UniProtKB/Swiss-Prot annotation:
Family statement: Belongs to the DNA mismatch repair MutL/HexB family.
Role: This protein is involved in the repair of mismatches in DNA. It is required for dam-dependent methyl-directed DNA mismatch repair. May act as a 'molecular matchmaker', a protein that promotes the formation of a stable complex between two or more DNA-binding proteins in an ATP-dependent manner without itself being part of a final effector complex.
The UniProt record lists the keyword DNA repair: yes
InterPro entries given in the database record: DNA_mismatch_repair_CS, DNA_mismatch_repair_MutL, DNA_mismatch_S5_2-like, HATPase_C_sf, MutL/Mlh/PMS, MutL/Mlh/Pms-like, MutL_C, MutL_C_dimsub
SMART domains, alphabetized: DNA_mis_repair (SM01340), MutL_C (SM00853)
Domain of life: Bacteria
Source species: Lacticaseibacillus casei (strain BL23)
Protein name: DNA mismatch repair protein MutL
Pfam families: DNA_mis_repair, HATPase_c_3, MutL_C
Keyword annotations from UniProtKB, A to Z: DNA damage, DNA repair
Lineage: Bacteria, Bacillati, Bacillota, Bacilli, Lactobacillales
């Protein structure tokens, strides 16, 4: 009896569906691409239960002839190509003839189509088998209804994510297709709620506004360039409008949304040093080329392609963006970007002179958050009135409005700071230190291992020189204070209280529909550190208050960065999110390089560093200090030399 046999058509289609149809978003992508190929100008997507229960895609395209309806569900049946030559000269999004057959193999599908308004054709296919076919009244276009996805392959269901995640993927792919086809009007509705709507007027900026929000669309600049083989154009963001991942760059080749690492890298290279580390631009890059220069028959999903002359295209793209940005005034508007009441951050050094356990903090109302922040934070610098509406301070402190003094009057500001320091050190620190908890064993061990340093000097406003009995030490002042700050924030964020600082003007954040869905799905993670985002429209959120440990003047940037983590990393554990937040805040609040410290500030930092659990590295892993032993110094100055005689004897 032969062991090799041919698989049935039904089983073959189910196997093929495993490559083409991975999740509900795959179904939407294939059906919408078919609608685009059918020259539709309006495409509507209706979703129920994130697509697992129902997906319905309707268009006003050219429709399907009655004689071709049943054939369209056969594997490798297509109207897009006919010969081998056509395969290497593809001008349509679909061409493999697998989409309908693969979808019908794992779902219950009903298709209704008409080439002209009036009488059309309806076919019902379930699990790859035709259930019925008949004439039906229908307007011009095609309507495909997909129910009970993966009903006959239940093993696939266990690999599905949450409904919010699956819906986000659907919205993302439709948004990409909308940006690639701004002349087509798209709508996406989920359980009766409109999620995405684009105008279809052919204006790419207008389409971007409908997807990412008006503020992002306004921050885009257009560009275009061409050579003998390629024509590139599109919209890309100014350097100040960035995201934490590359996912907000959409590459479109001959109308097809693709993923290509080298081209994405070329776009980023066009910005040069204008982007901050870890930040990426947003934009839509349209690339037109001869179809013979691109091979789209690489993967069943057609998201990956092979490009001829890829290096040439990358260079053209980088230069086009570099040239366009060079024409822009990239100097930020000081009035728009200047942090509130923070013109000269003399108080950047925030020494932990009074380590507090959050458990010892008094219970306060949200409106008292600023007073708590000023009187009990580990950073004396924060006692300056930095908030738009500062809470009243204790009369005996008499802090004064130092920030309104001229920024060039540094000696007077230093004197005022010293007076304020003395008052705070005598009034605030003793009270707080009385309740300081006993250090744990790890802190004691770190203190014992850390050298007893005597401060000597500062070098280049960046490094501190100190000595001990065993030699010379050089410390990175930014890394050192990062570690001190991190120890505080790790404890403060780990024990979230109800203390909140209200904003005078609430912060409104606009996101794309896909991002808004993801944010709602992970809102509990944000709330675990005291950040509350309330719905404010379809794809917008409002923040009315924030934790008291936020740095004044950087509230919006801090919130956006924390939200970006959620969008980039997805479902993070609360512990991981708090850890990232502590690291971020410790860096934001640490003194930067090229900042002069007086002797008292430097000594205070060296005094506090040994109390850290790990005083040897900053939270990012960089070393805090390096050591030159007495022997090392003596060798460098040739005070210790190898004997010539011993060398000769050894020879």
């Amino acid at each position: 009896m032969p062991k090799i046999h041919q698989l049935s058509a039904t089983l073959s289609n189910q196997i093929a569906a495993g490559e083409v149809i991975e999740r509900p978003a795959s179904v939407v992508k294939e059906l919408v691409e078919n609608s685009i190929d059918a020259q539709a100008t309006q495409i509507d997507v209706l979703i129920s239960a994130a697509g697992l229960q129902e997906i319905r895609v309707s268009d006003n395209g050219i429709g399907i002839a009655p004689d071709d309806v049943a054939t369209a569900f056969l594997r490798h049946a297509t109207s897009k190509i006919l010969t081998t030559r056509d395969l290497f000269n593809v001008h349509s999004l679909g061409f493999r003839g697998e989409a309908l057959a693969s979808i019908a193999a794992v779902a219950d599908v009903k298709l209704t189509t008409a080439m002209d308004s009036g009488i059309g054709t309806q076919i019902h296919v379930k699990g790859g088998e035709v259930e019925a076919q008949s004439t039906a009244a229908h307007r011009r276009g095609t309507d495909v209804e997909v129910n009970d996805l993966f009903f006959n392959t239940p093993a696939r269901l266990k690999y599905m994510k949450s409904q919010q995640t699956e819906l986000g993927k659907i919205v993302d792919i439709v948004s990409r297709l909308a940006m690639a086809n701004p002349d087509i009007a798209f709508t996406v509705s989920h359980d009766g709620n409109m999620v995405v709507r684009t105008a279809g007027q052919g204006d790419l900026r207008q389409t971007l506004a409908g997807i990412y929000g008006l503020s992002v669309a306004r921050s885009m600049v257009d560009f275009k360039a061409q050579d003998l083989d390629f024509r590139v154009s599109g919209l890309t963001s100014l350097p100040e409008t960035t995201r934490a991942s590359r996912n907000y760059l959409s590459l479109v080749v001959n109308g097809r949304y693709i993923k290509n690492f080298q081209l994405t890298k070329a776009v980023i290279a066009g910005y040069g040093s204008k982007l901050m580390v870890g930040r990426y631009p947003m934009g839509v890059i349209n690339i037109e080329m001869d179809a013979a220069l691109v091979d789209v028959n690489v993967h069943p999903t057609k998201a990956e392609v092979r490009l001829s002359k890829e290096d040439q295209l990358s260079h053209l793209l980088s230069e086009a963006i570099r040239t366009r940005l060079a024409k822009e005034n990239l100097i930020p508007d000081a009035l728009d970007n200047l942090p509130k009441r923070e013109r000269y951050d003399l108080d950047q050094l925030e020494l932990t002179l009074n380590k507090i356990s959050p458990k010892t903090m008094p219970s306060v109302q949200p409106q008292q958050g600023q007073q708590l922040r000023e009187n009990t934070t580990t950073n004396l610098a924060d006692t300056a009135a930095e908030e738009p509406t500062p809470a009243p301070t204790s009369p005996d402190l008499e802090i004064g409005d130092l920030d309104d003094q001229p920024i060039f009057n540094e000696p007077q500001r230093l004197a005022a700071w010293d007076q304020r320091y003395q008052r705070l050190a005598s009034n605030v620190v003793p009270t707080l230190m009385a309740d300081e908890p006993e250090p744990d064993i790890s802190h004691v061990e770190s203190a014992e291992r850390f050298p007893n340093l005597t401060y000597l000097a500062q070098v280049h406003g960046t490094y501190l020189l100190a000595e001990s009995g065993d030699g010379l030490y050089i410390l990175d002042q930014h890394a050192a204070q990062e570690r001190v700050n991190y120890e505080y924030y790790r404890q403060a964020i780990g024990e979230v209280s109800n203390d909140q600082q209200h904003l005078l003007v609430p912060i409104v954040l606009d996101y794309s529909a896909a991002d808004a869905i993801s944010i709602r799905d992970h809102r509990d993670v944000l709330e675990s550190v005291g950040l509350y985002l309330e719905d404010f429209g379809q794809n917008s959120f409002v923040v009315e208050h924030h934790p008291t440990w936020f740095k004044a003047g950087q509230e919006e940037d801090t919130i956006k960065e924390m939200v970006d983590w959620v969008l980039r990393d997805g479902r993070m554990t609360v512990a991981a999110f708090r850890e990232k937040t502590a690291i971020m805040m410790s860096c934001k609040r640490a003194i930067k390089a090229n900042h002069h410290l007086d002797d008292r500030q430097a000594r205070a930092l060296l005094q506090k560093l040994p109390e850290c659990e790990n005083p040897f590295n900053c939270p990012h892993g960089r070393p805090v200090l390096v050591h030159f032993s007495n022997t090392d110094l003596e060798k460098m100055f040739k005070r210790i030399q190898d004997s010539h005689e011993s060398g000769e004897m050894q020879a």
